Amino acid sequence: MGSDASLLPGTLDLLILKAVSLGPLHGYGILLRIEQISGDALTIEQGALYPALARLERQGLLAAEWGTSENNRRAKFYRLTAAGRRRLREETDGWQKLVTVMTAALNATPEEL
């Protein structure tokens, strides 16, 4: 699990929303899911994750309830709200458009100009 890739501003929230969209998770589970879906390219520090989770919950993008984790410990499980699903869709569309534009720009050749 390397941290070779750096997070761009605003991407942590998007990654959290995506991770939770795949199923309810507790905080540590979200860290592991982000590592998994990024092919172990991204490692999120707990010190960054938990303030982001609190912020997303305050914004109404995540809902949380207490439950029992797989190792029988009390944990707060997060799930997407309807507003969270909308935000994820909007942010995903925006990033996909940006990737398309940047790919075209970076692949430009003198012959195309």
Language model: regions and residue ranges:
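Amphipathic alpha-helical recognition patches that constitute DNA-binding helices
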Residues: 11, 15, 75, 79, ...
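Accessory beta->alpha helical hairpin/"wing" motif in late/C-terminal subdomains of nucleic-acid enzymes
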Residues: 80-84
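Basic amphipathic alpha-helical segments that dock to polyanions
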Residues: 49-56
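Beta-hairpin "wing" of winged helix-turn-helix
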Residues: 57-74, 79
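N-terminal helix-turn-helix DNA-binding core of bacterial DNA-binding proteins
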Residues: 4-48
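Short beta-strand/turn micro-motifs at beta-sheet edges
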Residues: 2-6, 66-67
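Amphipathic alpha-helical dimerization/coiled-coil segments
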Residues: 86-113
